């Protein structure tokens, strides 16, 4: 296989990885609390094995931390965050962070997320008395009627994306300055129109690399036939 094929293959691989990331963003443009993912690549210069050629290397992806829009729905247990920070839920004994505030009260009167995981307050799971009106202040203080029952754990720090809209800490977490908004949800921060344009561009880039590889392969075949005469 020629060096040009390797160059084209590295470019096609990077283009396809970028296409998959953008496609995932488009698919989750309506997912509550979803943060868009951005791919990044590195241009690798000549080395012992590169033989003077320049390659593109996929270096993974990072998420866009900017806020989505906050949409009011007047459901008392639905919460959104304005600013940097994350809610904390108990994921089988470990902390899972999220911006998805589609919370509800389960049969044990615990505040839980859409997956049934207990939402954490500063003192652990948040239990809400039956039949009381729930009110949540901007600082995360939770009231049942006139009684303060808990304070939401809202944290911030270095995190990595897990699944659709979950995050896990990669370092020490601290208290967040985000404002809690009750009766509202945060939308995805994906710009669907811009993402669709990016998706088309990524598809064309991948196709261009494929065509370049095919052209190089055809040239190699012709040269081999010529050399064999």
Task: Give the ranges of each region predicted by the language model.
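Amphipathic alpha-helical polymerization modules
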Residues: 1-229
